[in-house]
Structure formats: structure tokens, C-alpha cells
């Protein structure tokens, strides 16, 4: 009788441990995952980086300015989060390579990429957009996310897969007046996302596109949206 009770208690204990472990896995799926977030020292990018770190991921933030990186890292580390950072202009190959190399050196690999960097150097009619503005907008908003993804895929494959999140805008579906080249670039990101999703699925890498509305970007103080709206 006592032996039966003991065996029953052991079985109950094993079941409880399995259930607790399962709950922990579901609750903290990002524990010890490694995430890169571009343009992540303020606004939406900073909020994404903070949330990933709060969910126990190791996060590498980036910005074009060292002082912004230092401030963001100090703030998030002050909250007890696992965050490091480096300067990265996503339009420069050497900066993209450094960002990837830092994550691999510090944490052994990469599981998550959030491509958040974007610019809007022009406000007005599409007919007034110069070639220089087109080049800058498409280089940062479209080409850079594609090349960042290309840079991290080999590292994700080494870890059995990963996740890429491309931050786009509701402008991909409903163009906002005045944000002419920006609207086009964000629509292009939808095509990039869909193509990458098909190509990378066999490698167990998910690709998703996040479409934010401009009011959310403005409320987060992102990229001068509020200032440009006032000028308009």
C-alpha cells in the first residue's frame, strides 16, 4: 500500500515537472534567443528591443550614432535586461557585417532579426522626387532589409531556423498623402516579405511583415513624422 502510494507520488511529481516545464516553454519562448533590431535606440525600434529583452532574449540594438546606442544600452541594462549595442548604418555593408559579427561573438549566433530602419527624406508630390531621394529611400527602406536578411540567414541556419520581422507601414496598402517615395518603399517591402517567406520556409526561417500606421510612428516620435505633418 505504501509502495503504491510512493509510486503514485513519484508519477505525480514527474507529471508536475513536465507540466511546469511545458508552461515555462510556452510562457518564455524567447529565453536565450538572440535578436538583432535595427534603428532600435528610440521609438518603435526601442520598444521592440525592450519587449524582446523582457521576454528573456539577448538583444543587440543599433543606431547610426554611438551616443544613441550608449544611452539605449544603459537604459535597458539598468532595467536588468540582456542588451548590448553597436553603431550600424544599414546602408553600409561594413556596418551590417559588424552588427552580425557582434551578435555571433557575444551570443554564439542569431535567431531573430527585426528590420526597423527607415527614412523619409522627402515630403510632397511624387512628380517632384529627385533621383537622389529615390536612391536614398530605396537603399535604406528596401535594399537594406533584404541585405540584412541575407547576412543573418547563414547564422540562423546553424541554429536550426529563425524569425525575420520586417517593419513596414499601413502606407503599403493605403498611401499617405505627401509621403510619396516612402509609400512606394513600404509597398515594396510587402513584396520582399512574401518572396523571402517562400524562399526561406524550407530553411525553417519565418518571415513576417509588421504594418504600422503613421499615427503610431508619430506618437513614438519616429523619424520626424510629427514635424513633417506640422509643416504640411
From Swiss-Prot:
The active site is at 182 (proton acceptor). The gene is DHRS4L2. One of its GO terms (biological process) is retinal metabolic process. Substrate binds at residue 169. It holds the Pfam family adh_short. One of its GO terms (molecular function) is carbonyl reductase (NADPH) activity. This is Dehydrogenase/reductase SDR family member 4-like 2. It comes from Homo sapiens. It is found in: Secreted. InterPro entries: NAD(P)-bd_dom_sf (IPR036291), Sc_DH/Rdtase_CS (IPR020904), SDR_fam (IPR002347). Residues 1-19 form the signal peptide.
Amino acid at each position: 500500500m505504501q509502495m503504491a502510494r510512493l509510486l503514485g507520488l513519484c508519477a505525480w511529481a514527474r507529471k508536475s515537472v513536465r507540466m511546469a516545464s511545458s508552461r515555462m516553454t510556452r510562457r518564455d519562448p524567447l529565453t536565450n534567443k538572440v535578436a538583432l533590431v535595427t534603428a532600435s535606440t528610440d521609438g518603435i525600434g526601442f520598444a521592440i528591443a525592450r519587449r524582446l529583452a523582457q521576454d528573456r532574449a539577448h538583444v543587440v540594438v543599433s543606431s547610426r550614432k554611438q551616443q544613441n546606442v550608449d544611452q539605449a544600452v544603459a537604459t535597458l541594462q539598468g532595467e536588468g535586461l540582456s542588451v548590448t549595442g553597436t553603431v550600424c548604418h544599414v546602408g553600409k555593408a561594413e556596418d551590417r557585417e559588424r552588427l552580425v559579427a557582434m551578435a555571433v561573438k557575444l551570443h554564439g549566433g542569431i535567431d531573430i532579426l527585426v528590420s526597423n530602419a527607415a527614412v523619409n527624406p522627402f515630403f510632397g508630390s511624387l512628380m517632384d522626387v529627385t533621383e537622389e531621394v529615390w536612391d536614398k529611400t530605396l537603399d535604406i527602406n528596401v535594399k537594406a532589409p533584404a541585405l540584412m536578411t541575407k547576412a543573418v540567414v547563414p547564422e540562423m541556419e546553424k541554429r536550426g531556423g529563425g524569425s525575420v520581422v520586417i517593419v513596414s507601414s499601413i502606407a503599403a496598402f493605403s498611401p499617405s498623402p505627401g509621403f510619396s517615395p516612402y509609400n512606394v518603399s513600404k509597398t515594396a517591402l510587402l513584396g520582399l516579405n512574401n518572396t523571402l517567406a517562400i524562399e526561406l520556409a524550407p530553411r525553417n526561417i519565418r518571415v513576417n511583415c509588421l504594418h504600422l500606421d503613421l499615427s503610431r510612428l508619430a506618437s513614438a516620435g519616429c523619424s520626424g513624422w510629427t514635424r513633417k505633418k506640422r509643416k504640411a
